[in-house]
From Swiss-Prot:
Coiled coil: none annotated. It catalyses: Mn(2+)(in) = Mn(2+)(out); Fe(2+)(in) = Fe(2+)(out). It comes from Populus trichocarpa. NCBIfam families: nramp, Nramp_1. This is Metal transporter Nramp3.1. Divalent metal transporter. Can transport manganese (Mn) and iron (Fe). Involved in the control of cell-to-cell transport of manganese (Mn) between organs and tissues to monitor Mn homeostasis. It holds the Pfam family Nramp. Expressed in roots, stems, buds and leaves. It comes from the Eukaryota. The keyword Hydrolase does not apply. GO terms for biological process: defense response to bacterium; intracellular iron ion homeostasis; intracellular manganese ion homeostasis; iron ion transmembrane transport; iron ion transport; manganese ion transmembrane transport; manganese ion transport; positive regulation of reactive oxygen species metabolic process. Keywords: Golgi apparatus, Ion transport, Membrane, Transmembrane, Transmembrane helix, Transport. GO terms for molecular function: cadmium ion transmembrane transporter activity; manganese ion transmembrane transporter activity; metal ion transmembrane transporter activity. InterPro entries: NRAMP_fam.
């Protein structure tokens, strides 16, 4: 039996945790990079070949804009508000793009991702709170994503497979996809490209079948309109766009390309290509969300079913409304939902690896980190599936609680991100300028206020009793105090790793 020193696959690594090992990165600057002209400051002209080499991280990032939670928000917004909130979907996606571009900027400029920087930036007690909050957000999102995928499996199996069986299948095949990374990150990115393509095709097919009103659709996109009856759906559209774990994830994904951070030209060029591919990815995600919203706006807006439709019964409602056709719309919906649930579950596990590795620096092998993070989420998800398998109303209530959990966590990803990208000793010459900084904080404040409204509305309806109210008030006080601490605290991070 070999000794631990001879073990070719040790569970622990000797070196510090990194998002990607050097031999696993994609070579983006090589054969056609002119070191003399590209040097440290000159940015080479645009190249389609290089854009292709940098394409990938943005499409993994955009999955969080297409997860089952977002799809449920889309269908409810369409059924209740019709086409009237499409303009808000557009601007919410634009706000999400700004946040994700800042996350990518942080990762490219520093060579480290957000969780790693938080480990260096904050004292142990604050760092542990941030880590716990990130993990809770991830578990909440994962439950929604796995349940969404399990619902799709139940639809496609004609109800033969119960919800808990779909949960186990989803959890298992997640590792199969992550195994692709062993053959190169581009293989994993290609798999995600296929899943996004499946979503685009299925929901576009349904969009064509529904035949929505083109004038109403364009008016919904171009003319802002909001009524008192649709405020809750409007808040939901904005609130589910920014996912805490996605902010951590994108700052790590951009490090999958080999970049010399000592060459300003390379960093600038990388940021340019990442900005283009992220914008393209979120444009596609916007179209998919638009398809889902308009399908349900056309079919259910103004009907008695509008207020009762949800992710669990949406497929059957679609089947009853639009009938069978060449290929039953129920199964088209199931395929699209499965692609959304499966892809978002994988990115959730991927994000969990970076969050745990960055905050704790345990030095674990990737497969072991994936096993730990998957287990943390799958156990509560199986319990949820067993308890709520036959109750649509209970699943809707659970989904409201999980949305509330996501809303609580948003400041603990946004505030550290905005503080870090604003500090010259961390970002060097890539520090955000005063105008971008102001706009970013305004967007962050708007998102946090909107989610604060969600929390206030939720707790005003759900919190009853003296004991429960006291606990919630105490938690709220501690919550607000910690947010103030994050905003006001001076950066004390070491500068030994900062770009030059």
């Amino acid at each position: 039996m070999p000794s631990p020193e001879e073990d070719p696959q040790p569970l622990l690594k000797d070196q510090e945790e990194t998002a990607y090992d050097s031999d696993g990165k994609v070579l983006s600057f090589g054969i056609d990079y002119d070191t003399e002209s590209g040097g440290s400051t000159v940015v080479p002209s645009f190249s389609w070949r290089k854009l292709w080499l940098f394409t990938g991280p943005g499409f993994l990032m955009c999955i969080a804009f297409l997860d089952p939670g977002n799809l449920e928000g889309d269908l409810q917004a369409g059924a209740i508000a019709g086409y009237s909130l499409l303009w808000l979907l557009l601007w919410a996606t634009a706000m999400g793009l700004l946040v994700q571009l800042l996350s990518a900027r942080l990762g490219v400029a520093t060579g480290r991702h957000l969780a790693e920087l938080c480990r260096e930036e904050y004292p142990t007690w604050a760092r542990m709170i941030l880590w716990i909050m990130a993990e809770l957000a991830l578990i909440g999102a994962d439950i929604q994503e796995v349940i969404g995928s399990a619902i799709a499996i139940q639809i496609l199996s004609n109800g033969v497979l119960p919800l808990w069986a779909g949960v186990i299948i989803t959890a298992s095949d997640c590792f199969i996809f992550l195994f692709l990374e062993n053959y190169g990150v581009r293989k994993l990115e290609a798999a995600f490209g296929i899943l996004i393509g499946i979503m685009a095709v299925t929901f576009a097919w349904m969009f064509a079948d529904a035949k929505p009103s083109a004038p109403e659709l364009f008016l919904g996109i171009l003319i802002p309109k909001l009524s008192s009856k649709t405020i809750k759906q409007a808040v939901g559209v904005v609130g589910c766009i920014i996912m805490p774990h996605n902010v951590f994830l994108h700052s790590a994904l951009v490090q999958s390309r080999e970049i010399d951070h000592n060459k300003k030209g390379q960093v600038q060029e990388a940021l340019r290509y990442y900005s283009i591919e992220s914008t393209a990815a979120l444009a596609i995600s916007f179209m998919i969300n638009l398809f889902v919203t308009t399908i349900f706006a056309k079919g259910f807006h103004g009907t008695e079913l509008a207020n009762s439709i949800g992710l669990v019964n949406a497929g059957q409602y679609l089947q009853d409304k639009y009938g069978g056709g060449f290929f039953p719309i129920l199964y088209i919906w199931g395929i699209g939902l499965l692609a959304a649930g499966q892809s978002s579950t994988i990115t959730g596990t991927y994000a969990g690896q970076f969050i745990m590795g960055g905050f704790l620096n345990l030095g674990l092998k990737k497969w072991l980190r994936a096993l730990i993070t998957r287990s943390c989420a799958i156990i509560p998800t199986i319990i949820v599936a067993l308890v709520f398998d036959t109750s649509e109303d209970s699943l809707d209530v659970l989904n409201e609680w999980l949305n509330m959990l996501q809303s609580i966590q948003i400041p603990f990803a946004l505030i550290p991100l905005l503080c870090l990208v604003s500090k010259e000793q961390i970002m060097g010459t890539f520090t955000v300028g005063p105008i971008l900084k102001m706009v970013s904080w305004l967007v962050a404040a708007l998102v946090m206020l909107i989610n604060g409204y969600l929390l206030l509305d939720f707790f005003s309806n759900e919190v009853t009793g003296v004991v429960f109210t006291t606990v919630v008030c105490a938690f709220t006080g501690a919550y607000v105090t910690f947010i103030i601490y994050l905003i006001s605290r001076e950066v004390t991070i070491s500068t030994w790793y900062c770009p030059t």
